[in-house]
Amino acid sequence: MQTATYTPGHSAPVLSLMAQRTAETHAEFFLPQLIPGWSVLDAGCGPGTITLGLARRVVPGLVTGIDVEDSQFAKSREQAESEGLNVEFRKASVYQLPFQDHCFDAVFCHALLEHLSDPAAAFTEFRRVLKSKGLIGLRAGDMGGILVDSESEGPAQGLATYLANREKDSRDPYVGRKLGRLLRKAGFDLQRITASYEVITETLLKIGPSLAAQFAAPSYCSLQDKASDHSLFVALAWCEAIGRAE
């Protein structure tokens, strides 16, 4: 069964943190590839803050952001209107994109594949809507490379619980390292693949209680407990890939 579930949920703290992501901080590897006038799809756009950055890059081109949770779009819609950006937000699933074949010059996808039960099916749709020689830019986390240090065992236990829930729901927490393989299998020519780290300590401190409530897992709460003594360090591995439709 093809499903897309955002494991951290959509609580106010989670949405607030997602909204802090920008194209400059989380799509930097792909921005130089974009050309003014292009039509771009931002798949799994969340609150749309990255979408806005992509739109600024391709003015006067159209950037379309899609997500299964459309309650996130309001602020970015207002911002796009105030800046005069050519942006459209739509509720849609990457498994069934509501677009004609070969209509986008580029597809961007950030932090989505690790939340899909069938990433390969999404790649098939990405390939369908891309024009010939169109570009795809992907960024996905890889939990196999996560770094954790704390004076307490609680944070590591909390992250282990999070990882177990992802795997139980048929999500691949190690999809980042597989981006090149997935691109090739979907018929793309792999142009570039890189990896990077992001320190996410503050992020986890803020969303720990939300995760605890969602999964009824008290070990998540220990993340919040470490806020005062600064003993916690967590860094997440990201993998980035660029492909071209053949």
Residue ranges, per PLM feature:
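A short SAM/SAH-binding and catalytic strip from SAM-dependent methyltransferases
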Residues: 105-118
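Conserved Class I S-adenosyl-L-methionine
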Residues: 173, 177, 192-246
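A short acidic, Gly/Pro-enriched loop at the edge of an enzyme's catalytic core
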Residues: 95-106
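Conserved alpha-helix/loop element of class I SAM-dependent methyltransferases that forms part
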Residues: 20-36, 53, 57
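Class I SAM-dependent methyltransferase Rossmann-like catalytic core
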Residues: 2-22
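A short glycine-rich, Lys/Arg-flanked "PGG" loop and its adjoining helix->strand segment in the class I
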Residues: 120-135
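Conserved catalytic/acceptor-binding region of the Class I
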Residues: 135-202, 215
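Class I SAM-dependent methyltransferase SAM/SAH-binding core
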Residues: 41-43, 47-96
